[in-house]
C-alpha cells in the first residue's frame, strides 16, 4: 500500500462544538471516515472476524471508516519520523543507520476492545510498503509471575500498576527502540493465568512496535514506558457499557476458555447464569472498576488519539490531540 498525494487535505473540519482551547480535535464518525482519503480496503470479512475479540461487533465498515483513516494517520507520522531521522544524520554527517522503530501504545480498560484495536493496527500497518515489519507485544507478559505476586500480596491487585515488572518492560522497549538486534518479551497464558516459564516472543528490529496494555500510559517521577511512545491510542467507552461487556465476556469464557484443560478459572465453568453474573459483577466492582477509575482513566488525557465507543461496541467519535 502506498500513500497517494500525502500532502493533500480533504478539508474535513472537526465538530464545531469543540472549543478552540481544547487540546483535541473532535470528529464524529462521518467526519473521521472522510480522512480515509480513498485508501483501499485491505482486509476481508474473514480476516476481520479472526481479529476481533469476544463480544465485539467490528466489521468491514468499522475497519473502513475508523481504522483505515487511523492507519493512514500513523503511516504519515512514521514517514515524518523517518525524515527527521534522516535530517539528523545529515546534520551529523553520518551514514544511514538502522532506523529507530516507531513505538505505539494502545491503552484502555479490560473488556473495552484495546487488544482488537492493537491487532487491527498491526495488520493494517503491515500492508504499507514502507514499514512492513510491525510487531505487537502485550504487557500481560510483564506481570510478575503468580508466585511472586503471591509473595508480595498482590494477587488481588493483578492488573494494577504495582503488579507489573515496570523495569523489565521499560528495558524491553528501550532495547527495541535502541536498535538491538533481538529482544525477548515474556509470554503470558490467559488459560493458566500466569507467565509461561521459559517462553518468549522475540522482536527483531521492527519498523513499528505496538505495546498494548491497561496501564501503558502511566507516568511517574522517573522514565516510564509511555515516555518512549511516538503515538498512543486510548480506547474509551462509558463505564456502564464496559461493565456490561465484561460480564458478557465472562459468560462466554465460562462456556469456552474456562473449560480447557488446566484452566485457572475452571471452577467457574459449571456455574449457572445468575451465579456467573454475580461473580463477574463482583470481580468488576472490586478489581477492574477501581483500577479503571484510579489508574487507567486518568491516563486518557495523555493519548495522541481517543477512540470513543458507543454501547454497541462500535466507535462513535474520534478525538485527536493537536498539541
UniProtKB/Swiss-Prot annotation:
GO terms for molecular function: ATP binding; pantothenate kinase activity. One of its GO terms (biological process) is coenzyme A biosynthetic process. Keywords: ATP-binding, Coenzyme A biosynthesis, Cytoplasm, Kinase, Nucleotide-binding, Transferase. InterPro entries: P-loop_NTPase, PanK, PRK/URK. It is an enzyme of class 2 (transferase). NCBIfam families: panK_bact. This is Pantothenate kinase. It comes from Corynebacterium glutamicum (strain R).
Amino acid at each position: 500500500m502506498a500513500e497517494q498525494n500525502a500532502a493533500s487535505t480533504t478539508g474535513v473540519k472537526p465538530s464545531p462544538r469543540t472549543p478552540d482551547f481544547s487540546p483535541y480535535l473532535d470528529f464524529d464518525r462521518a467526519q473521521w471516515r472522510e480522512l480515509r482519503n480513498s485508501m483501499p480496503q485491505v482486509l476481508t470479512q474473514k480476516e476481520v472476524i479472526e481479529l476481533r475479540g469476544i463480544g465485539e461487533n467490528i466489521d468491514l465498515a468499522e475497519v473502513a471508516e475508523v481504522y483505515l483513516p487511523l492507519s493512514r494517520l500513523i503511516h504519515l507520522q512514521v514517514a515524518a519520523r523517518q525524515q527527521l531521522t534522516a535530517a539528523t544524520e545529515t546534520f551529523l554527517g553520518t551514514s544511514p543507520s538502522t532506523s529507530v522503530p516507531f513505538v505505539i501504545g494502545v491503552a484502555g480498560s479490560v473488556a473495552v476492545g484495546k487488544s482488537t484495536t492493537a491487532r487491527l493496527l498491526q495488520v493494517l500497518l503491515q500492508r504499507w510498503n514502507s514499514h512492513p515489519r510491525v510487531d505487537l507485544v502485550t504487557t500481560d507478559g510483564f506481570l510478575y509471575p503468580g508466585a511472586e505476586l503471591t509473595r508480595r500480596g498482590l494477587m488481588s491487585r493483578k492488573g494494577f500498576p504495582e503488579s507489573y515488572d515496570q523495569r523489565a518492560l521499560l528495558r524491553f522497549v528501550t532495547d527495541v527502540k535502541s536498535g538491538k538486534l533481538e529482544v525477548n518479551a515474556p509470554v503470558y497464558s490467559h488459560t493458566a493465568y500466569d507467565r509461561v516459564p521459559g517462553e518468549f516472543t522475540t522482536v527483531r528490529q521492527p519498523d513499528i512496535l505496538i505495546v498494548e496494555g491497561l496501564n501503558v500510559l502511566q507516568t511517574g517521577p522517573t522514565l516510564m514506558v509511555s515516555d518512549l511512545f511516538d503515538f498512543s491510542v486510548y480506547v474509551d467507552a462509558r463505564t456502564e457499557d464496559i461493565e456490561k461487556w465484561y460480564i458478557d465476556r465472562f459468560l462466554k469464557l465460562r462456556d469456552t476458555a474456562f473449560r480447557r484443560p488446566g484452566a485457572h478459572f475452571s471452577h467457574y465453568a459449571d456455574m449457572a447464569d445468575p451465579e456467573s453474573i454475580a461473580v463477574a459483577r463482583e470481580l468488576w466492582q472490586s478489581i477492574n472498576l477501581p483500577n479503571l477509575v484510579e489508574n487507567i482513566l486518568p491516563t486518557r488525557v495523555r493519548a495522541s488519539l481517543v477512540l470513543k465507543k458507543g454501547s454497541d461496541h462500535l466507535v462513535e467519535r474520534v478525538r485527536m490531540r493537536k498539541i
